[in-house]
Curated annotation (Swiss-Prot):
Protein name: UPF0280 protein MTH_727
Species whose genome carries this gene: Methanothermobacter thermautotrophicus (strain ATCC 29096 / DSM 1053 / JCM 10044 / NBRC 100330 / Delta H)
SUPFAM superfamilies linked to this entry: ApbE-like
Gene3D superfamilies (UniProt xref): ApbE-like domains
Lineage: Archaea, Methanobacteriati, Methanobacteriota, Methanomada group, Methanobacteria
NCBIfam families documented for this protein: PRK04334.1-1
Amino acid sequence: MIPSDVSFNVLESWCGTMERIVIGETRINLRTELRNHGLSGFVLGERMKLMDYIRRNPEFLTSLEPIVVSEGPLIVRMMSRASRKAEVGPMASVAGTISQLSLMHLMGKGSRCSIIDNGGDIALVNNRKITVGLYAGSSSLSGTVGFLLKPGGPRGVCTSSGTVGHSISFGRADSVTVFASEASTADALATSIANSANGPDDISAVENALERADDFREHFRGVMVVVGEHAGTVGRIPRLVMTDRKAVLGDLWDEV
C-alpha cells in the first residue's frame, strides 16, 4: 500500500538506536545493530529506479490491476510479482517492497537484527522476541493487544486500513494485518483483503475480508482483520498478548 500514517517503533536500544529516513513519500523508522549501513543512499537509489521506470511506463503508477513486468529494475519486478499474487495494482506494494529491499541490503551487510518500518509496512529479522502492537484506528482493540514475534526472519508484517491514513482502500477495515515471508507480498495482500471489508454491518465486513483472505492462503502465514469491535483471523498469526495502550499508540514496538 502507499505509505500510511501508521508507525511502529522499537522502544529499547538492544537492536540499535532509532533512525529516521525521509525521502519523498518514503518515511522509514529504522532499528539496526549496524553502523555506516548506507541505507539512505540505497533507498534513494531504489526510488530513482522506480520513478525512472514510471516515467517510461506511466500505467505502472495508476493501474489498479496487476501488471506483468518481464524486464526492469528489481523493485519493479518485485512489485509486479506481488500485484499478481494479490490481484491488485503494483503500487499497492510499494512501501512493503522498499522495506523488503532495505532489509535485504542490511542483511547483505551482516545484520542479524534489523526492523524497517515504512509507514506501517515492516520487514524485519530479529534475534530476540518482539511484540508488535496492533493499531486499528478507533477500535477498542487498538493499542490493547499485540503480536508476540519469535526470533526469526526475514519476514514481513504489513497493515492496510480503510479508516486510517491516506492509502487507497475500497473497504472499511480499521486494520488488516498480514504476516508473510516477504513484506512486498504482505503489503499487496493487506490492500487486497482490506478492499473486501464491506457489508451491511461490521461482522459481515470481517467475514467478507476473511473470505477474500482465504483465496490467498498459499501466499501468507496469517491474517487478522479488525472492523470496529469485531475481529477475525485466517491462518496462523503470532500469539496475541496484552499491551499498554498509551505505550503502543506512541511507540508500537517493544522489547520482551
